């Protein structure tokens, strides 16, 4: 398979799976396994950057609102209506810090992420989605920003494991502690923005290296495809979330795990 075709397929996979609760990292690893593709993990982060741009566009008004709130807070000119936004900013900050710590720890064990490990995590994600869909677990402490941020950060950090959906586990954790689906969706994707940019800053040297090794056109083609597909994917997921049909993703993950196990004979 040519690098151009691989970049396009990886872009499609990233664009679809970043916003659907089925684990983009798990699907990228699965695809790499079957075609024996050996690209740097930095390429995956670059694809994540493309889908983060989709989030920024989708939530541009909300992001601007939060930014203006932060400016007013910095200038000590806050108004009463800023209180909710300030709580959200603080929550996202705590989530980002905790996620970064957990994600850094997990990244040290990337060599252990085997195909069987991914498939087990697909099943775990499927179970979490079912629990989310049918409100299986509720512990309301969203009013405690510190506790809520730590809990959601820990859960989102586990999303660094391939096969565990970052969006799925974050929305699940937000729902468990009392946030409604719309708020859980918003928190999940807004908190991804600083996390991806933080990962880029931490691995800036590797980013430079990958542009020296890989074809500039191929890298950006994959990112462009991920961006375009992501625009459609995020709208599709929002509709599924509102229509309470997330269990379809559980069925998909269970079926995918069984099919791969059968053909690979794990």
From Swiss-Prot:
InterPro entries: UppP (IPR003824). Keywords: Antibiotic resistance, Cell inner membrane, Cell membrane, Cell shape, Cell wall biogenesis/degradation, Hydrolase, Membrane, Peptidoglycan synthesis, Transmembrane, Transmembrane helix. The keyword Transcription does not apply. The chain crosses the membrane at residues 4-24, 39-59, 86-106, 112-132, 145-165, 182-202, 210-230, 246-266. It is found in: Cell inner membrane. One of its GO terms (biological process) is peptidoglycan biosynthetic process. It comes from the Bacteria. One of its GO terms (molecular function) is undecaprenyl-diphosphatase activity. It catalyses: di-trans,octa-cis-undecaprenyl diphosphate + H2O = di-trans,octa-cis-undecaprenyl phosphate + phosphate + H(+). NCBIfam families: PRK00281.3-3 (NF001396), undec_PP_bacA (TIGR00753). Catalyzes the dephosphorylation of undecaprenyl diphosphate (UPP). Confers resistance to bacitracin. This is Undecaprenyl-diphosphatase. The gene is uppP.
């Amino acid at each position: 398979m040519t690098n151009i075709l691989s970049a396009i397929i990886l872009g499609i996979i990233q664009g679809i799976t970043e916003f659907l609760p089925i684990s983009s990292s798990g699907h990228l690893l699965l695809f790499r396994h079957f075609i024996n593709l050996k690209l740097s993990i930095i390429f995956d982060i670059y694809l994540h950057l493309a889908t983060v741009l989709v989030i920024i566009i989708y939530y541009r008004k909300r992001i601007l609102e939060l930014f203006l709130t932060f400016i007013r807070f910095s200038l000590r000119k806050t108004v009463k209506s800023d209180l909710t936004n300030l709580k959200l900013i603080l929550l996202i900050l705590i989530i980002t810090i905790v996620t970064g710590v957990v994600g850094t720890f997990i990244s040290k064990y990337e060599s252990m992420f085997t195909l069987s490990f991914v498939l087990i995590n697909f099943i775990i994600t499927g179970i979490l989605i079912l629990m989310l869909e049918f409100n299986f677990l509720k512990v309301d402490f969203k009013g405690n920003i510190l506790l809520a941020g730590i809990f959601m950060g820990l859960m989102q950090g586990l999303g660094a494991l391939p096969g565990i959906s970052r969006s799925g586990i974050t929305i699940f954790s937000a729902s468990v502690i009392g946030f409604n689906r719309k708020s859980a969706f918003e928190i999940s994707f807004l908190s991804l923005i600083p996390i991806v940019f933080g990962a880029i800053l931490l691995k800036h040297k590797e980013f430079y290296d990958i542009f020296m090794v890989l074809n500039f056109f191929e890298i950006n083609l994959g990112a462009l495809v991920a961006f375009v597909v992501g625009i459609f994917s995020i709208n599709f997921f929002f509709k599924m979330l509102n229509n309470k049909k997330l269990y379809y993703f559980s069925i998909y993950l269970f079926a995918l795990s069984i099919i791969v196990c059968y053909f690979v004979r794990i």
